[in-house]
A protein has these predicted regions:
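Conserved alpha/beta-hydrolase catalytic His-Asp/Glu region
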Residues: 150-156, 164-223
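Catalytic active-site module of serine/aspartate enzymes centered on a nucleophile-bearing elbow/loop
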Residues: 253-284
Length: 284
């Protein structure tokens, strides 16, 4: 009787949603410095899609992608050290160590064919991860990142920006997050993201931002020979021709009118572009 009841519930669920539930399994693995890294894994397939969040975010920001892409790929969403459910016992939150976090997960899962997908700061992180993972990586997808590989900010500008976060982290972060949404954005989504990111541990967030500001991707890019696609909003200019000096196989797809968190703002449109980009990388 219980079996029949369960089957009836499953049929009702599939009829209502048009799909099966994707059950993500949460695991942990230690990074190179011993910090525990939490990640979710779901789906099957020869190719792994590894999603890396941005500054002061976590793996839940990819919730609109995990279920869809788990039908055909092994989907992995990672909490970098100091974020989400991962350990917070790291002294300095560098892009290089974040890259080690990603590499530790991929190597632990023994995935030999990977596309790395990184949002915002995650774009820098996956460059470092690609360097460490070598020929396991078939391509890189940035999400509203890689606007310019060349840093045009002075040290004074960087330090001044960082000081505002150091002096009043919550207020500055909320204002910073709101500025990255378009004026017509869903106010509940804006509030949710602003509240979430401003609740990050300030010392970790400031460390990560400082290291991001002083991170130079060019040396890493010059040693990578990988196709790179970026899906960006049109709020910020992208130095396409300048970037092509450092990445020969480079493409940008724009979502007009979207903000920085495009995978949350317009998930269906974003998922279409992501699906297209994955297909392009796998067919190169």
């Amino acid at each position: 009787m219980k079996r029949i009841y369960f089957i009836m519930l499953l049929i009702l669920f599939v009829s209502y949603t048009g799909n099966f539930l994707v059950f993500a399994q949460t695991e942990k693995v230690k990074s190179v410095d011993g910090v525990e890294i939490s990640f979710d894994i779901s789906g099957n397939g020869d190719t792994g899609l590894v999603f890396v969040h941005g500054w002061s975010c976590d793996k839940s920001y990819w919730q609109n992608q995990a279920e869809l892409f788990s039908d055909n790929y092994k989907v992995v969403a990672i909490d970098l050290a100091g974020h989400g459910n991962s350990g917070m016992n790291r002294k300095d939150y560098t892009m290089e160590l974040f890259g080690d976090d990603v590499a530790a997960v991929v190597n632990h899962l023994k995935i030999n064919k990977v596309i790395l997908i990184g949002h915002s700061m995650g774009g820098s992180v996956i460059l470092e991860a690609a360097k460490k993972l070598g020929n396991k990586v078939v391509g890189i997808i940035g999400v509203d990142t890689y606007q310019s590989f060349v840093d045009n900010w002075t040290s004074e500008q960087k330090d001044g920006f960082l000081k505002s976060f150091h002096d009043n982290f919550v207020l500055t972060t909320k204002g910073f997050v709101r500025s990255m949404f378009p004026q017509n954005a869903d106010t509940l989504l804006v509030k949710k993201v602003a509240d979430d990111m401003s609740s990050a541990p300030p010392e970790i967030a400031v460390s990560a931002m400082r290291n991001l500001f002083y991170y130079d991707p060019v040396p890493t890019l010059q040693n990578l020979n990988l196709p790179l696609i970026s899906i960006n909003c049109d709020m910020y200019p992208v130095s396409i021709e300048e970037n092509k000096k450092y990445v020969k196989d480079y493409e940008v797809k724009f979502m007009k009118g979207a903000g920085h968190f495009l995978m949350l703002e317009r998930p269906d449109e974003f998922n279409g572009l992501l699906k297209e980009s994955i297909s392009e990388l796998l067919n190169k």
